[in-house]
Amino acid sequence: MRHRVKRHRLGRYGSHRKSLLRNLSREIVEHGSIVTTTAKAKALKILMDKLVSKAIEAATTDDKAKSVHLRRQINAVLGDRRLTNKLVDEIAKNYVGRHGGYVRVLRIGFRRGDAAEMSLVQLVEASSQEG
């Protein structure tokens, strides 16, 4: 029975799922938006919201040790120091004062080959956080 077990399994074993989400999160940090299937987009949104929350905390804290610790946690997921620095130094600055909802998933239709539902995953613009 799978009571109270919530995880987007995506039809993959654990290491493959981890690698997939790592690659998708790297692409969204690098490019700002990506197109993927809706199931992958929903799993990615959860991971990216957690990463951006850590990045905001790392960017705003005065404690050097805590900032380094959070950067290392982010780098453990992204696997690239350049992307970690971009997330903390550039992207997180736009979301200071915002609590969650850093990533938007927009459904854009169905893929032609297999009719899989596709979605656009993008970082929410800094200007749209007002309101």
Swiss-Prot record:
Q: Which organism is it from?
A: Thermotoga petrophila (strain ATCC BAA-488 / DSM 13995 / JCM 10881 / RKU-1)
| Gene Ontology biological-process entries | translation
Task: Please state the span of the N-terminal signal peptide per the UniProt entry.
Answer: none
Family indicated by similarity: Belongs to the bacterial ribosomal protein bL17 family.
Task: Write out the GO cellular component annotations.
Answer: cytosolic large ribosomal subunit
Q: Its gene?
A: rplQ
Give the record's subunit note: Part of the 50S ribosomal subunit. Contacts protein L32.
| Family matches, as InterPro entries | Ribosomal_bL17 (IPR000456), Ribosomal_bL17_sf (IPR036373)
Q: What is this protein called?
A: Large ribosomal subunit protein bL17
Q: Does the keyword Ribonucleoprotein apply?
A: yes
Q: Which GO terms describe its molecular function?
A: structural constituent of ribosome
